[in-house]
Regions:
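Nucleic acid-binding interface residues in structured DNA/RNA-binding domains
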Residues: 2-121
Length: 121
């Protein structure tokens, strides 16, 4: 059961049934420190393949086993339908939130975007 993402190469299932691309995405998510975030596109950029939509697809299918609330839209918003749960995690971890009109319901990307320091390859 291999799949393709547009013009992206075909990703094969590994021995535990997880596509290689998904395994790579989740491996990065596992490294994001508490209180920090990455946008979907940031993860694709680190991997050098796919794009925000492909990373989002992986997160929607396989992300429940990782710290999914640390992977957000470039605007600082949580995944659709998970805003309240993400907000609770962000507050618990001390993630920097935008003040003002959105009443802290959006991450301050300038302050909370992880720079990848210490990321394993």
């Amino acid at each position: 059961m291999a799949g393709t993402y547009g013009d992206e190469p075909e990703y094969r299932l590994d021995s535990v049934g997880l596509p290689d691309f998904a395994e790579a995405v989740l491996g990065i998510v596992d490294q994001i420190p508490a209180g920090m975030v990455l946008a979907y596109g940031d993860i694709a950029e680190v991997l050098g393949q796919g794009g925000p939509r492909q990373v989002g697809s992986v997160m929607s299918r396989y992300g429940s086993s990782v710290t999914w609330w640390r992977v957000i839209r470039a605007s600082g918003e949580a995944p659709e339908g998970l805003q309240d749960e993400a907000l609770a995690h962000w507050r618990e971890e001390g993630t920097a939130l935008v003040r003002g009109a959105l009443a802290g319901r959006r991450v301050d990307m300038e302050l909370a975007r992880w720079d990848g320091e210490g990321m394993a390859n």
